[in-house]
């Protein structure tokens, strides 16, 4: 049939991770050898995926051995703000979003990108046209405290946004870790707004200066930018306060946090 009939209407990235078996280890050539064996064992599958990446628009394949899908998305795929031409040819900027097929898709929330995990069928329904298919305190300590606090508060099925002056103390890695744990505290996602730390990480991971400038300008203009001044905070349905300074070394255990 005609592949264009089911061409994705939004960009789709298929990241092949958790696939390379460890046949060789402890040698300089171990990685290359393991990836080579992976291709040999699954050649027919990879040939099909290669065809798909050429047959469809808006579809790309990230090969095995590249990294875990959430980290690949964080470092290489996500832009925070996208731009494209509308029907008149004018360039339009719009916020990046991500619908993933894994519960820890929420990791990308740490970059200011709204994203969460759904089932495979639900993801297909989202992109196929016409609904053809239905000091001494670590980031871990903070995460455990956040998880415990949000579990007690009750955020199942909620969108949680982190805000306030304490965010400037959190690196992108810290934010991504907290966002990644959204399934553990029960929220649909744990979102971090775009701010200077977002821009620094985009620059660190090789995003273009043009994309970074667009992200900042768009976020400020549309009200997505995070300010330290509390007078500029959004009005939320419910709020929960956590003083980062009160976080102590923590240890997780059965049912705790």
Model-derived segments and their meaning:
Residues 1-257:
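Fe-S-dependent hydro-lyases/dehydratases of central metabolism
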